[in-house]
């Protein structure tokens, strides 16, 4: 027998009361986005489960993809069949025969939501357990902690049989907690921050600052590849490329070296906030970790935050660098993040950046800039690209090969 579908059990959605179906429908849409590279797949949801019909597709890559999607509590590859006692008996016998080894213990666990079915749960447990003993007389039944728990569900539309339960990612479906703008540089920290924001249901749009010719096409492709990795957790993500060359040159030419980073980050924050307002976001997300670098001291954060009243979420703010690296490796962004392309935060980095910048000094040094004009030109020049889970080719790898 081949698996018919993957049955997805919902996570925290059980706590969402009247909004439950809105959350479930969002999860369904996210699953469809994540599984877009598998065109034969179909997805449908009800109040208790989401059903991913395989339609001949190999189940293993589907399971690997679904394990990462936020909002999924657990999933099981299942056999779907008609609600017929003879068919159930044959299926249970075939499955247990294929799993059998010496000393194997098992139990049948039946759940019947279709109360019009001819047998109740206890009768089905007895009948199907007896059918297993007919073909495997040496097998042992064990009610507590058996090697195999064969789950049989009798639902209104069909019967389902499964024996594996695979842990999902948990969290909330992406998009159920509103929209935020993720400031993604291309380093290690910001993709991890994005991952953690996605886990709590935030629909992120990625804001990436590019300063050609100082930053290369490889840096842009790297940021897009990082964004693509994040799509595995909840579906398509809008990638917003911001032209930043003019602003960085202005800062380099007019500002004291010690304040280059502070003023650069203040402009980035202004632009991100303007994009957020334009695209109806609610928060800004970044990868700042307290005390990790000069721009991430409390004094620096205060001076940079002063340009906006928008809430700023810093998911990794209390994490050590090694903790962030471990998480980046776990979510498969680390190897991309360490690829050798400079970003806007490093190209003009001063040797001795100010670790305790004063807000008054930052505002004084900005008096020589046309702040509104610079921000407006940057926002009007943005390029928005939808990033999907499907990988056509790996542009960053190609660029690295060309450099070597």
From Swiss-Prot:
Gene Ontology CC: one annotated term: cytosol
Coarse class of the protein's main subcellular location: cytoplasm
Entry-linked InterPro entries: Rossmann-like_a/b/a_fold (IPR014729), ThiI_AANH (IPR020536), ThiI_fer (IPR054173), ThiI_N (IPR049961), THUMP_dom (IPR004114), THUMP_ThiI (IPR049962), tRNA_STrfase (IPR003720), tRNA_sulfurtransferase_ThiI (IPR050102)
Entry superkingdom: Bacteria
Catalytic reaction equation(s): [ThiI sulfur-carrier protein]-S-sulfanyl-L-cysteine + a uridine in tRNA + 2 reduced [2Fe-2S]-[ferredoxin] + ATP + H(+) = [ThiI sulfur-carrier protein]-L-cysteine + a 4-thiouridine in tRNA + 2 oxidized [2Fe-2S]-[ferredoxin] + AMP + diphosphate; [ThiS sulfur-carrier protein]-C-terminal Gly-Gly-AMP + S-sulfanyl-L-cysteinyl-[cysteine desulfurase] + AH2 = [ThiS sulfur-carrier protein]-C-terminal-Gly-aminoethanethioate + L-cysteinyl-[cysteine desulfurase] + A + AMP + 2 H(+)
Swiss-Prot/TrEMBL keywords: ATP-binding, Cytoplasm, Nucleotide-binding, RNA-binding, Thiamine biosynthesis, Transferase, tRNA-binding
Pfam families xrefs: ThiI, ThiI_fer, THUMP
EC number: 2.8.1.4
Enzyme class, broadest EC rank: transferase
Binding site for ATP: 183-184, 208-209, 265, 287, 296
Function comment: Catalyzes the ATP-dependent transfer of a sulfur to tRNA to produce 4-thiouridine in position 8 of tRNAs, which functions as a near-UV photosensor. Also catalyzes the transfer of sulfur to the sulfur carrier protein ThiS, forming ThiS-thiocarboxylate. This is a step in the synthesis of thiazole, in the thiamine biosynthesis pathway. The sulfur is donated as persulfide by IscS.
Homology family: Belongs to the ThiI family.
Protein name from the UniProt record: Probable tRNA sulfurtransferase
Annotated organism of origin: Streptococcus pyogenes serotype M1
Gene name in the database record: thiI
